[in-house]
Amino acid sequence: MSCPYAGSGNDHDDAAVPLSTEVGKIYGEYLMLDKLLDAQCMLSKEDKRPVHDEHLFIITHQAYELWFKQIIFEFDSIRDMLDAEVIDETKTLEIVKRLNRVVLILKLLVDQVPILETMTPLDFMDFRKYLAPASGFQSLQFRLIENKLGVLTEQRVRYNQKYSDVFGGDEDALTAIRSSEQEPSLLELVQRWLERTPGLEESGFNFWEKFQQSVDKFLEAQVHSAMEEPVERAKNYRLMDIEKRREVYRSIFDPAVHDALVRRGDRRFSHRALQGAIMITFYRDEPRFSQPHQLLTLLMDIDSLITKWRYNHVIMVQRMIGSQQLGTGGSSGYQYLRSTLSDRYKVFLDLFNLSTFLIPREAIPPLDESIRKKLINKSV
């Protein structure tokens, strides 16, 4: 029996069959490759002293900027979807999909650093003089990513100048910076979304009150267990540890303590938003909280990967120019970059610290029938 999908052998045409008769752009025109592939201007070559690795340096940083543009594109669309009173399940799924895309892009950017490291410090020195006053500190798109994500101006490390000063008289860049500082960041929008978590209502399930009761019971059970410790020194140690844990929980149960931590920069979320994040974490196996939990996990992944990228960048800079030299843009180079690895630049710091407030699974307040019905019918 002949293959039902095979032709007769007489109707084969070597000429390519166009998918459409409409006039369109060919591959190179659509991607504007004439401009893209002609944008690598090696200053060492113009100086009649071409340095081979300058080409790699340019290509790598241009690739970074292209991916930065895509990240901004994704962040803007995600912020648009989050900027609503109610976010239905289909939108949450799309937000999760796009956040995951950003995560994969950032993984690619982290893995791109070792390619630059194939260049030796001596190779870099051959063309470094041509870079001044250019500097990665002047990457407008990376600053926009930070602002759109939620890095606050007061949280930034200042070295000699405000971060936006490097853009000098570039009014378009300064306008973009100001706009990104004023519009709602991803952090602010996620905070609003968490504040609406169903189950937090005092007139309803009132998760927060039930959680406090569960924590009190959990700690009292630990005290009771510690009191049965036959060795006095071990008993006192356990009791001291329990008191420390009680103080940790007080930092989330007492709104005044929480607000003080926010003002100090040790917390980011509002008290209500933190409650929502804890509730989603505890009940992540519930169908309605499955996607929100994925969303929170992806936000932590983004923070982690940006930190990893910063770290790889720091190590590469130290390897290329050491820890004492100034950067090409006049910043303190290695010292400045190392300072950006602190929690000051971690936007979703509170999500990383949620594990501090966990209690054993058996101590988690059970959902009653009314909240289960509400979760079935309510968008988060």
Curated annotation (Swiss-Prot):
Question: Which BP terms does GO give this entry?
Answer: L-tryptophan catabolic process to acetyl-CoA; L-tryptophan catabolic process to kynurenine; ommochrome biosynthetic process; protein homotetramerization
Alphabetical list of SUPFAM superfamilies matching this protein:
Indolic compounds 2,3-dioxygenase-like
Keywords recorded for this protein, A-Z: Dioxygenase, Heme, Iron, Metal-binding, Oxidoreductase, Tryptophan catabolism
The positions annotated for binding heme are 313
Coiled coil segments of this chain: none
GO MF terms held by the record: heme binding; metal ion binding; tryptophan 2,3-dioxygenase activity
Q: Return the Pfam families for the record.
A: Trp_dioxygenase
Positions annotated to bind substrate: 57-61, 128, 328
Superkingdom of this protein's organism: Eukaryota
State which pathway it belongs to: Amino-acid degradation; L-tryptophan degradation via kynurenine pathway; L-kynurenine from L-tryptophan: step 1/2; Pigment biosynthesis; ommochrome biosynthesis
User: Which cofactor(s) does the record list?
Assistant: heme
Reactions that this protein is recorded to catalyse: L-tryptophan + O2 = N-formyl-L-kynurenine
- Cofactor, how bound (note): Binds 1 heme group per subunit.
InterPro entries in the record, alphabetically? Trp/Indoleamine_2_3_dOase-like, Trp_2_3_dOase
Enzyme nomenclature, EC number: 1.13.11.11
Protein's job? Heme-dependent dioxygenase that catalyzes the oxidative cleavage of the L-tryptophan (L-Trp) pyrrole ring and converts L-tryptophan to N-formyl-L-kynurenine. Catalyzes the oxidative cleavage of the indole moiety.
Q: Which family does it belong to?
A: Belongs to the tryptophan 2,3-dioxygenase family.
| Subunit relationships | Homotetramer. Dimer of dimers.
Q: What protein name is recorded for this chain?
A: Tryptophan 2,3-dioxygenase
- Primary gene name: v
